[in-house]
Amino acid sequence: SVTSGSPVVAIEGDSAFGFSGMEIETICRYNLPVTIVIFNNGGIYRGDGVDLSGAGAPSPTDLLHHARYDKLMDAFRGVGYNVTTTDELRHALTTGIQSRKPTIINVVIDPAAGTESGHITKLNPKQVAGN
């Protein structure tokens, strides 16, 4: 995008965005034609909602539900969309790419939809939780 001027579409989950999200400052500072699509299911792999410690804390695989990642663009003068339907996604993606402005599309998806691609919760077996 920097040298070619071509639009870029980055597709990631809400967990991945947690690691790289502040790159939006650079994207906005250079006014790059980057559209970031965040599939937001409220968790790592989808979150399991199980608190193994018994302390009432959120599960380590749960993220803040209903997070509005699109609102981050207000701070950096980019464009943000929050979408919940395929029609809204189609519109936001088309508009974001065509505008050539830094854009985040927060795509709220059902946490139970699809299949888990990994088993991070297996890293914390129940027999050692809370020890």
Predicted feature residues:
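Thiamine diphosphate
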Residues: 1-131
